[in-house]
């Protein structure tokens, strides 16, 4: 007889899957940034290693204006391929309190 998997177990398994997927995502984003002369910056639960079963991946994109759209598209696709929900913002749009809040936890991928 199959063991019944509880909701808490399913949530824990999904959180772990997301944590592992973020590790793979880091490699892909770093490789892209190095090849295209920009950088991605992770923050939030993905940067802290505290992904939950429903966490998204917070990414700042810091590329030249001519490369920004392609870098953004790459980050989106890379997240979707790993069944992660991206929350992407251009680094240039980060101002004031938001920047102050996320700066301590930023992980630069370049």
List each language-model region with its residue ranges.
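Metal-dependent nucleotidyltransferase catalytic core
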Residues: 16-26, 63-100
């Amino acid at each position: 007889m199959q063991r019944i998997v509880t909701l808490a177990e399913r949530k824990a398994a999904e959180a772990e899957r997301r944590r592992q997927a973020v590790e793979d995502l880091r490699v892909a984003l770093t490789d892209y940034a190095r090849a295209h002369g920009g950088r991605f910056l992770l923050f939030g639960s993905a940067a802290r290693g505290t992904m939950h079963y429903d966490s998204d991946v917070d990414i700042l994109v810091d590329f030249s204006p001519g490369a920004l759209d392609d870098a953004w598209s790459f980050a989106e696709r890379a997240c979707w391929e790993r069944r992660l929900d991206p929350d992407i913002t251009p680094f240039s749009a980060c101002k004031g309190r938001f920047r102050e809040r996320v700066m301590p936890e930023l992980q630069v991928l370049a």
